[in-house]
Amino acid sequence: MPKPEKIQKVEELYQKMLNANALIFTEFKGLSVADLTQLRGKIRPLNAEYRVVKNTLALRAIQRMYPDKDLEKFFVGPTAITYCYDDPFGVLKALVDYAKDHELLKFKGGIIDGEVYSADEIRELAKLPPKEVILSQVVGSISAPLSSLVWNLKWPVNKLVWTLDAIAKEKEKISINQ
């Protein structure tokens, strides 16, 4: 029979996981408390938190969310979870940049919007621009042809108006001179 404290801890982890739109799993073996504090300070402004977890409890919590996914591989050895509550790509970029300077921080993998990613895929995803940039690029690529179409449709009408205006001014000059 599980202890009430463990049941409560699993429930707390489960609630954190439910509220996050991405979970990044890392190994932190060998990093000092000061290093972890520095890492937490880098990702806190990005609306993310970095927490060391007990593997058995975290695995129970995550299996409630994703019972059909094989996630045991992420919970071998010392494990910390980064909970991303906003755009995960900015947090990924910050984690990868931090790992360049602190080689002891190793990626195990992650879950972003319900999809499981390996450590290598997580590093590749970190190279993507933030969601807002991608969306603005998509909107720009959609609106550019539309603007061009509108201009091309307006051009003959504008040309006709300018021509008629020029003819009217010319006739006005002729009638004044007579």
From Swiss-Prot:
Regions that span the bilayer: none
Domain of life per record: Bacteria
Keywords: Ribonucleoprotein, Ribosomal protein, RNA-binding, rRNA-binding
InterPro entries for the chain: Ribosomal_uL10, Ribosomal_uL10-like_sf, Ribosomal_uL10_bac, Ribosomal_uL10_bac_type
GO annotation terms (biological process): translation
Entry GO terms, CC: cytosolic large ribosomal subunit
A molecular-function term among this protein's GO annotations: structural constituent of ribosome
PANTHER family associated with the record: 39S RIBOSOMAL PROTEIN L10, MITOCHONDRIAL (PTHR11560)
Function: Forms part of the ribosomal stalk, playing a central role in the interaction of the ribosome with GTP-bound translation factors.
Sequence similarity: Belongs to the universal ribosomal protein uL10 family.
Subunit comment: Part of the ribosomal stalk of the 50S ribosomal subunit. The N-terminus interacts with L11 and the large rRNA to form the base of the stalk. The C-terminus forms an elongated spine to which L12 dimers bind in a sequential fashion forming a multimeric L10(L12)X complex.
Entry protein name: Large ribosomal subunit protein uL10
Name of the gene this protein is made from: rplJ
